[in-house]
């Protein structure tokens, strides 16, 4: 009996050991499969990371190449002992002018099926070959307008000789025809002499220049579109002004100028000792009072159009100055020093911002140039 019990015990232990062995073998197989799957995932992850790394390196090389090209696209200007580095000749063919605007078709696909594109000229004698073109963009601000005050300040503080050697261009960047009519009427009534002499022009930008989304009614939800359209407004005005003068001065429709601002500006440009200044600031606010060589305007416009949806134009201007002078990965301190050499500042500022009602409906701004 005792032997029988021992045999049963051995049999039970054997069964238990067999079951445990089967369980262990099963778990080992599962673990092995999991390890194999894990290893496959790790290998797949490594391959993915390697592809991403290679792609990133390629993108980085391409980006550096593009930035390098942009950086050296605008050649340093040669020094000149005269205020006039080069007089721009009168345009002989309309085709020459139209080509200025063909660049828009590369960045704005909706224009690629259009024919010749050019702003509408509401008032103007097509003056060219002058030293300075002064550009002012304007849109309807509802019941608030500063344009007449701005034009009075800008034009009345020129000498007759300075007025003869310049052209002020007002660009109406508003699709409301009534606003265009009001601007034309005001200009013809208040500044008849300058209109007749060709010192003052008014152009209008047709709606077809803009992507349709930028023409939607302005709301707080699409405030970004207002900023985007503003960049295009400036670019179009720059393209129009580029063949007219040696220098281009950017103003806005809600500023006033200091007495003798034009004389001071002209004398300062002639006295700048830097051989390769990029642009000169006659105001520290935004895009107001920025002076460019007209021959450089196309390069600025190219850069602005590449990033016109990304940032306001004054920020893009700061970016291109950094790009112009700073090496990729170079020290920030030396970069900022080089930037100051190409972005020349004139103090005290020659222009002051006076508008409080923004061109964006319902928005107020109380920006002042403290160096004015």
From Swiss-Prot:
Record PTM text: N-glycosylated. O-glycosylated; further modified with terminal sialic acid residues.
Gene responsible for this protein: Mgat4d
Glycosylation site list: 54, 143
Protein name (Swiss-Prot/TrEMBL): Alpha-1,3-mannosyl-glycoprotein 4-beta-N-acetylglucosaminyltransferase-like protein MGAT4D
Native source organism of the sequence: Rattus norvegicus
Sequence intervals crossing the membrane: 9-29
This protein's UniProt keywords: Differentiation, Endoplasmic reticulum, Glycoprotein, Golgi apparatus, Membrane, Signal-anchor, Spermatogenesis, Transmembrane, Transmembrane helix
Gene Ontology biological process: cell differentiation; negative regulation of protein glycosylation; protein N-linked glycosylation; spermatogenesis
Species lineage: Eukaryota, Metazoa, Chordata, Craniata, Vertebrata
Ranges in the topological domain labelled Cytoplasmic: 1-8
Purpose of the protein: May play a role in male spermatogenesis. In vitro acts as inhibitor of MGAT1 activity causing cell surface proteins to carry mainly high mannose N-glycans. The function is mediated by its lumenal domain and occurs specifically in the Golgi. A catalytic glucosyltransferase activity is not detected. May be involved in regulation of Sertoli-germ cell interactions during specific stages of spermatogenesis.
UniProt subunit comment: May self-associate; specifically in the endoplasmic reticulum prior to its translocation to the Golgi. Interacts with MGAT1, MGAT3 and MAN2A2; may interact with MGTA1 specifically in the Golgi.
């Amino acid at each position: 009996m005792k032997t029988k019990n021992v045999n049963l015990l051995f049999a039970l232990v054997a069964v238990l050991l067999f079951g445990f062995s089967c369980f262990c073998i099963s778990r080992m197989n599962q673990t092995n499969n999991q390890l194999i799957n894990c290893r496959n995932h790790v290998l797949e992850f490594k391959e993915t990371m390697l592809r991403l790394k290679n792609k990133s390196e390629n993108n980085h090389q391409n980006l550096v190449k593009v930035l390098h090209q942009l950086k050296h696209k605008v050649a340093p200007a040669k020094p000149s002992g005269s205020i006039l580095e080069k007089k721009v000749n009168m345009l002989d063919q309309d085709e020459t002018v139209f080509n200025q605007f063909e660049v828009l078709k590369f960045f704005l696909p909706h224009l690629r099926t259009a024919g010749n594109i050019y702003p509408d000229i509401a008032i103007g004698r097509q003056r060219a070959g002058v030293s300075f073109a002064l550009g002012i963009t304007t849109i309807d601000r509802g019941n608030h307008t500063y344009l007449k005050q701005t034009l009075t300040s800008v034009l009345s503080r020129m000498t007759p000789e300075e007025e003869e050697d310049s052209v002020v261009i007002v660009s109406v960047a508003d699709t409301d025809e009534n606003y265009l009519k009001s601007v034309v009427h005001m200009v013809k009534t208040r500044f008849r002499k300058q209109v007749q002499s060709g010192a003052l022009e008014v152009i209008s930008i047709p709606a077809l220049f803009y992507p349709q989304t930028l023409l939607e009614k302005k709301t707080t939800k699409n405030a970004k579109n207002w900023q985007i359209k503003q960049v295009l407004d400036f670019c179009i005005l720059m393209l129009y002004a580029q063949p007219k003068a040696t220098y281009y001065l950017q103003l806005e429709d809600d500023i006033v100028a200091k007495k003798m601002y034009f004389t001071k500006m002209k004398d300062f440009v002639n006295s700048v000792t830097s051989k390769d200044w990029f642009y000169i600031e006659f105001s520290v606010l935004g895009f107001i009072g920025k002076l460019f060589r007209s021959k450089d305007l196309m390069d600025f416009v190219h850069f602005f159009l590449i990033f016109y949806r990304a940032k306001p134009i004054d920020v893009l201007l700061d970016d291109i100055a950094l790009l112009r002078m700073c090496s990729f990965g170079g020290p920030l301190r030396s970069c900022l020093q080089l930037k100051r050499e190409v972005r020349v500042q004139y103090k005290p500022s020659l222009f002051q911002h006076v508008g409080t009602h923004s061109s964006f409906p319902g928005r107020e701004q109380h920006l002042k140039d403290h160096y004015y």
